[in-house]
Amino acid sequence: MARVPLTFSDVAIDFSQEEWEYLNSDQRDLYRDVMLENYTNLVSLDFNFTTESNKLSSEKRNYEVNAYHQETWKRNKTFNLMRFIFRTDPQYTIEFGRQQRPKVGCFSQMIFKKHKSLPLHKRNNTREKSYECKEYKKGFRKYLHLTEHLRDHTGVIPYECNECGKAFVVFQHFIRHRKIHTDLKPYECNGCEKAFRFYSQLIQHQIIHTGMKPYECKQCGKAFRRHSHLTEHQKIHVGLKPFECKECGETFRLYRHMCLHQKIHHGVKPYKCKECGKAFGHRSSLYQHKKIHSGEKPYKCEQCEKAFVRSYLLVEHQRSHTGEKPHECMECGKAFGKGSSLLKHKRIHSSEKLYDCKDCGKAFCRGSQLTQHQRIHTGEKPHECKECGKTFKLHSYLIQHQIIHTDLKPYECKQCGKAFSRVGDLKTHQSIHAGEKPYECKECGKTFRLNSQLIYHQTIHTGLKPYVCKECKKAFRSISGLSQHKRIHTGEKPYECKECDKAFNRSDRLTQHETIHTGVKPQKCKECGKAFSHCYQLSQHQRFHHGERLLM
């Protein structure tokens, strides 16, 4: 095999004088340790070392090294810090090949003879983990790695970027981060032309195009593109959560998840959106938030073409088509399509309600539920539709409303072909075919398909009308009744017929009106078979033409 000589300068890292000035004395010492560690890794590989004849005296060699640095400095304002720091003789070369190793105990003695690093190098060539974190009992082979790990406990972050103020625990991460400010992305994907700052990012990205997921979980069969993702996933099955937050006692499967969580207690939100000023504790949260301003929704459902900002939202949405519910409650066996829905449900069994409303005393399991509830008292509706200006208490209500403007109805009933804009409306409709009425009124025994219908019905017995119109003081049993009534005062008629442009203040009235154009008469008399467009027409017909029979 042909030899390919590799000089010491080939494994060194060059810095400009300006970059070197960024580092303080501690950082420079650490850099020396890192470079020394990198070099020992080369030594530990199957490389052979040869030395040129020692033609130069030590004094002359030092002169030439200094002259080399001065010439390099003049030429391109950079210098080889590796050689500058270690003062290693330039006569040593590394050659690839199958020659036998030199007959010495460890060739590293020739390199490390001027340093106290030989014991460290020998220890690194074994798998021994001599350095242990006493707090978490975690072992490390290198003292440098232990030092970096301990900074997680102490909170010391020594490497700060002068451009953006971001700080790093590990020096390599600091150097890696500085490339962000250059906007240089030299590694381009041939499949989609997407560019990356780091070669490792390109390699990870290219697996997406191949669709390959070589790492499979033996317990559930789920496959992953990366081994680290499989390792994280397997902790779900064993229920292992070894990392505990000392502030609140919450446990985590991964150490980094605990570190991210701890920012909640410290109130640290270093990542700020330049568009709206909103701050976030995690960089990934800021990245996802930015998509709101850009309107980017890269994850699209192939069945209904609905798009999402995040991939996990697409996965959860696809379960509405497949009916899959992988998250099951151990207490009652109820299953859910979303993990977050299961967590919310579990609080029913614990009966834990930590958040009390000061206005009415009602308690809630989550702070977000309390915030939403308080808007009933304040009347706040912060979410506005840009199409028609209508405002809503909850963002989810706004999303549901916006479908009206798109005319998109992706959820179709397989039995009758009727389509709906929301999956909840489809499920409600399907109960008509099933004939299910599981909700029974204890007062009169009447049954209903929906719990909301039962609650509305019960107000007949109680006489409760909690929703009052501020304009005329008229009271209603439901908030939807109040909303419809308000349109009398405002004159709003949001439901418009596409055939004749006639508008209505209620959707059911639009539906009734559209039968004029379609000729559909869905209301059929069971006595004589005569059909009608509207329910009230059928009622009138039955009273006048079949009144006697109905009374009998």
UniProtKB/Swiss-Prot annotation:
* GO MF annotations, alphabetized: DNA-binding transcription factor activity, RNA polymerase II-specific; RNA polymerase II transcription regulatory region sequence-specific DNA binding; zinc ion binding
Family annotation (CDD domains): KRAB_A-box
Q: Which SUPFAM superfamilies match?
A: beta-beta-alpha zinc fingers (SSF57667), KRAB domain (Kruppel-associated box) (SSF109640)
Supply the SMART domains for this chain: KRAB, ZnF_C2H2
Q: Where is it located?
A: Nucleus
Q: Where are the zinc fingers (C2H2-type)?
A: 131-153, 159-181, 187-209, 215-237, 243-265, 271-293, 299-321, 327-349, 355-377, 383-405, 411-433, 439-461, 467-489, 495-517, 523-545
What's an example GO BP annotation here? regulation of transcription by RNA polymerase II
Coiled coil feature spans:
none
What are the KRAB domain coordinates in residue numbering? Answer: 6-78
PROSITE patterns named among the record's database cross-references: KRAB, ZINC_FINGER_C2H2_1, ZINC_FINGER_C2H2_2
* One GO CC annotation: nucleus
Which InterPro entries does the record cross-reference, listed alphabetically? KRAB, KRAB_dom_sf, Zinc_finger, Znf_C2H2_sf, Znf_C2H2_type
UniProt keyword annotations, A-Z: DNA-binding, Metal-binding, Nucleus, Repeat, Transcription, Transcription regulation, Zinc, Zinc-finger
Job description of the protein: May be involved in transcriptional regulation.
Protein family per UniProt: Belongs to the krueppel C2H2-type zinc-finger protein family.
Q: What is this protein called?
A: Zinc finger protein 404
Organism the protein comes from: Homo sapiens (Human)
